[in-house]
Amino acid sequence: MEKNLPDIFFFPNCVNVFSYKYSQDEFSNMSKTERDSFSLAVFPVIKHRWHNAHVVKHKGIYKVSTEARGKKVSPPSLGKPAHINLTAKQYIYSEHTISFECYSFLKCITNTEINSFDEYILRGLLEAGNSLQIFSNSVGKRTDTIGVLGNKYPFSKIPLASLTPKAQREIFSAWISHRPVVLTGGTGVGKTSQVPKLLLWFNYLFGGFSTLDKITNFHERPVILSLPRIALVRLHSNTILKSLGFKVLDGSPISLRYGSIPEELINKQPKKYGIVFSTHKLSLTKLFSYGTLIIDEVHEHDQIGDIIIAVARKHHTKIDSMFLMTATLEDDRERLKVFLPNPAFIHIPGDTLFKISEVFIHNKINPSSRMAYIEEEKRNLVTAIQMYTPPDGSSGIVFVASVAQCHEYKSYLEKRLPYDMYIIHGKVLDIDEILEKVYSSPNVSIIISTPYLESSVTIRNVTHIYDMGKVFVPAPFGGSQEFISKSMRDQRKGRVGRVNPGTYVYFYDLSYMKSIQRIDSEFLHNYILYANKFNLTLPEDLFIIPTNLDILWRTKEYIDSFDISTETWNKLLSNYYMKMIEYAKLYVLSPILAEELDNFERTGELTSIVREAILSLNLRIKILNFKHKDDDTYIHFCKILFGVYNGTNATIYYHRPLTGYMNMISDTIFVPVDNN
């Protein structure tokens, strides 16, 4: 469907687009093209104003029940009006008088082509649209946006590139075409903060109709923005809630979905046309109940995110529109061209608002000498922070590979630098409190972080990035540190230059960068289980295909050996984390055990019942050797004796030396097997 967005339906960015009510005199002075723009108002008016409305007679004049109170009456016969009263907004016949809006209400019936609308219908649609506050203009003021979506406060002023008229037209044309859309944008253009809001607006106006060429029945469904982490769900939903003029969730178009969500973050009066911010896992549970699907952070290749893309592509007729948003297409453009059916690529150009200077600090040690490389890196980092120091009251972010390195580098820096030091990563619970300290401190703050800060939280006062160029890539029963990809570098660099000029200091040779194929270092059971649930053909229906297909087929055989029906697996997928696939054998035993095991997965509380149940699975690990690490830690070199990765080597830390065997309770809890 080729449709251009008329100017009168732009979302009010409160910079050069404002909410506006048009007068009948203005309509009279418009060109035919401008007048015809109002024909599209029939769709939001039918949904939000005329749904369940009827004709009444009010003070002798026929009106719509949404205009005035009155007794329900049979509609009058309509021919060409004898007279038009622009001031009273009424059509006058010899026997009766009818409001502009009521005339349009009676004329706009199912299957009517919108290009057949005459001036009389368009004038009524103008009045109905004014009542809904759906129109916009290049003149106005912020306060005119109060009430547009039921909001008590005005929309935020947004000068970002994604809400310019040009970008709005391009995004609308892609959305209404029903083609899959891949959207990229420069740093700070508002991909995540504004594009979902724009798609919410389009959904409010036109969502649910199969065509915008004629009047049809509609099936209203919300938009969903699917995100890889709870922190992102909370951050972006709050940003958009406030920018739309709301202070509370209830009754707003914003809803949140993630596991163990607190009561106060549940919208008890959601809008059918609204937008749901959800973690990937919960998005999958009701994927086809949404009209527009937005998948963010595609470049991260979160496992469930990649599965959503595969499912949406397989069942694209069940979704009206799909948007994939990514920081960069460096690694994925060619695959997306082949994988998606006739995709549209949209790039919103934009650079950081302020200049970013780059500084390279050379490490003279080869990375193959891991410990020596890291020691040299830490020395270089101290020198770099001394030479390139954030101003007082500002902050710098040090990107390291892992949580353990956060603590290692913080301890090292604290002994050598006089600045405030903080750690932020995905497992830190009091991030808001830490940021309050960072923002209120008159001193320099240095934040040591994992890749979590690439996108999860925006630090307002950051001026410097110190990038070690590493990421920890988890693997079954282990993992490894790898150099980052270009997309990760771009994300890290883009943390500065938004509010002030920034400096990006990097400590790695650019030739070390490489694409990271995460699927080759993941447990693959989710791909099997969701493929069964959504009838995907493996491996060709997967967005990213594993390099070693033998592991995929071994995983399938292992899952089949559990002797659990597809229907039961689907229930387990919808209700439980199953951080270890073997837990499925316990979830099906009894509701009481399932409840306690679920609580363990969510909170870490290990009851004796759950402990004994997991031990009964005999998830055994053989200890090959050990060595002393420090006062209370021993490194054990082991071999996995169960599951798909039977025979895989693993390294496990324990507070005393062990021999023989241990049983696995979770990825962090191990129980020695009694040798007696």
Curated annotation (Swiss-Prot):
Q: Which GO terms describe its cellular component?
A: virion component
Q: Which reaction does it catalyse?
A: ATP + H2O = ADP + phosphate + H(+)
User: According to the UniProt record, what class of enzyme is this?
Assistant: hydrolase
Q: What is the effect of changing R498A?
A: Defect in ATP hydrolysis and RNA unwinding
Substituting D296A results in: Strongly reduces NTPase and helicase activities
GO molecular function (one): RNA binding
Task: Briefly describe its induction.
Answer: Expressed in the intermediate phase of the viral replicative cycle.
What's the reported outcome of changing R492A? Defect in ATP hydrolysis and RNA unwinding
How the protein is affected by changing E300A? Inactivates ATPase and helicase activities
Gene3D superfamilies given in the database record: P-loop containing nucleotide triphosphate hydrolases
Q: What is the recorded phenotype of mutating G497A?
A: Defect in ATP hydrolysis and RNA unwinding
Subcellular locations according to the entry: Virion
EC number annotated for this UniProt entry: 3.6.4.13
Mutating R229A has which effect?
A: Inactivates ATPase and helicase activities
Q: What does this protein do?
A: NTP-dependent helicase that catalyzes unidirectional unwinding of 3'tailed duplex RNAs and plays an important role during transcription of early mRNAs, presumably by preventing R-loop formation behind the elongating RNA polymerase. Might also play a role in the export of newly synthesized mRNA chains out of the core into the cytoplasm. Required for replication and propagation of viral particles.
Q: Subunit structure of this entry?
A: Monomer.
UniProt record similarity statement: Belongs to the DEAD box helicase family. DEAH subfamily.
What protein does this entry describe?
Answer: RNA helicase NPH-II
Which species expresses this protein natively?
Answer: Vaccinia virus (strain Western Reserve) (VACV)
> In the record, what lineage is assigned to the organism producing the protein?
Viruses, Varidnaviria, Bamfordvirae, Nucleocytoviricota, Pokkesviricetes
